[in-house]
Amino acid sequence: AQPEWITSDPDMRFKYGSIGAERDAGIPYWIFYVLPRMFPDKLPGPGGYAAFGVVWEEGQELPVGFSKKVVGFPRVANNCASCHTTSYRTQADAAPTFVPTGPNHTLNLWAFFRFLVDCAKDPRFNADNLMAEINLVTDLSFIDRLLYRFVIIPITRKRLLEREQQFAWLYRDDFPPWGRGRDDAMNLTKYFMIRWPMDDSFGPTDMPSLWNLGKYRADQGMRMNFAGDSHDAWSVVPPTEVVEIL
């Protein structure tokens, strides 16, 4: 379970709550933590994960839209808020105001997905190098050090390399980058989630806001999900997570 400061507040739940992605797509927390330190050359700019244009609230250990949950060991995954939390400033030097369910117009999701795969493809992604970086920032127990070195790191690399096939369309020269604030939601669903064979379809769109959903009338054929397959907001949440949330 996640801490009460997340589960007891609807806004915090939206921004940092788990939707179950940690099980299959989660990245071990300490690997996630050190990747920008090890591979700054693979980031789109300086600033660690901030280079991807994520929304990051002051004092939080993770950006908005990144959940942390223990599934055997702490893992990090994305939730809906990655793409659907926006920010604005009333003046150039003012602190940002964050708006949950707004479109994240600064997120470079294309670059983030490629970053994870490119790190795993690099020969520097190995137990010796990762453990050296992890040991600089935390003191793992003896058992955890063994698990990371001999189990967690090798399996993480294997799983990330498997994503290269699922994300092969991100590397096609005839497909341009999506741009900030955009994603190719249907191809993500087809190739990454349900693993359909790849075709030549390409359709990045602006990330939409999620507010005022009451205007969509399912009885008139207006479906909530962009794919048009459902009017149920819970349809993207694994059943085990629905039980836990309820």
Regions of interest found by a model, annotated:
Residues 1-91, 100, 111, 115-246:
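Extended surface/linker regions that mediate inter-domain or inter-protein docking
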Residues 95-107:
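Short cysteine/histidine-rich metal-coordination sites, predominantly Zn2+-binding motifs
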